[in-house]
Structure formats: structure tokens, C-alpha cells
């Protein structure tokens, strides 16, 4: 039995550290600008809408809709090749931000654009947890 190679870990930068810390705790957070009310993801040191510095992190409801997706059937990356087929998707959170993620917990052929999904978390090592999504039952 061969072992599945370790999944590549995300690079945790200063502005994104609160996002990854929350993911390790099983929470999905996104940035919110206290000046203009804009939500954004990926984490940045300023609001992309009004340029206010230091947007705050707020907890997301963790649900959204599949905007688009593809089923990966072949991967040149060993850590992902062992997992094919898998779904790579863009998910629009209810708060209005879009994340690139995987859809898990279902047959890849059952995923549909417009499908409701909910955040799930997968620890890939002691320091890194990734945010994935699964269909809402």
C-alpha cells in the first residue's frame, strides 16, 4: 500500500495569519471594512473598496453557493494525483466574497453550479488547516 504524499501547505503571511488561525480552530473568517462595510477575501492590509487600512476579521456564516467548478481527473502534483477525481470550485459565500476551494463529501459528478455548500475544515498537518466545502443536505 503506497502512502498518499503530504498535501502542500499554504504559505501563511502576516495579513493572512488570522484567517489560517481561525481555520485551525474550525472557524471561517473573512475581512470586513469598518469604514465602508465591504467584505473581502483574500486577506489584505487595506480595504480594496475604499482603501481604509486594517480591515477587521469577522466570522462568516460558512455557507455559500457554487459559482463554478471543474472535476480534476488527472494531476501532475503527486499529493493531488492520489486524490483524483476531486472538485476544484469557486464558492460565493453568503457575505459576497468568492473563495477557491474543493468540494468534498459527495460524488464529484453530483456537484452543480448554484448548489448550496457549507464550510468544512481539513487539518493537513499540525500547523495547517484548509477550508473546504461540502453540499448542504
Residue ranges with predicted function:
Residues 69-75, 122-126:
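Short, conserved beta-turn/loop elements at beta-strand boundaries and strand-helix junctions
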Residues 1-28:
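A broadly conserved sequence feature marking short terminus-proximal activation segments
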Residues 32-35, 46-52:
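Short, cysteine/histidine-rich loop/knuckle motifs that typically chelate Zn2+
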Residues 27-30, 44:
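Residues immediately within or flanking Cys/His clusters that coordinate Zn2+
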Residues 96, 100-137:
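Well-ordered alpha/beta subsegment
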Residues 64-67, 103:
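Conserved hydrophobic positions within beta-strands
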Residues 37-40, 53-54, 73:
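Cys/His-rich microdomains that often coordinate metals
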Amino acid at each position: 500500500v503506497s502512502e498518499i504524499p503530504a498535501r502542500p501547505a499554504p504559505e501563511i503571511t502576516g495579513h493572512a495569519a488570522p484567517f489560517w488561525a481561525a481555520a485551525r480552530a474550525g472557524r471561517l473568517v473573512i475581512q470586513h471594512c469598518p469604514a465602508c462595510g465591504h467584505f473581502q477575501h483574500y486577506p489584505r492590509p487595506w480595504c480594496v473598496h475604499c482603501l481604509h487600512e486594517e480591515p477587521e476579521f469577522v466570522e462568516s456564516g460558512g455557507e455559500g453557493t457554487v459559482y463554478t467548478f471543474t472535476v480534476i481527473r488527472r494531476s501532475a502534483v503527486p499529493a493531488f494525483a492520489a486524490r483524483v477525481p476531486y472538485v476544484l470550485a469557486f464558492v460565493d459565500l453568503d457575505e459576497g466574497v468568492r473563495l477557491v476551494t474543493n468540494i468534498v463529501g459527495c460524488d464529484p459528478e453530483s456537484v452543480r453550479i448554484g448548489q448550496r455548500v457549507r464550510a468544512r475544515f481539513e487539518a493537513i498537518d499540525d500547523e495547517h488547516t484548509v477550508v473546504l466545502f461540502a453540499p448542504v443536505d
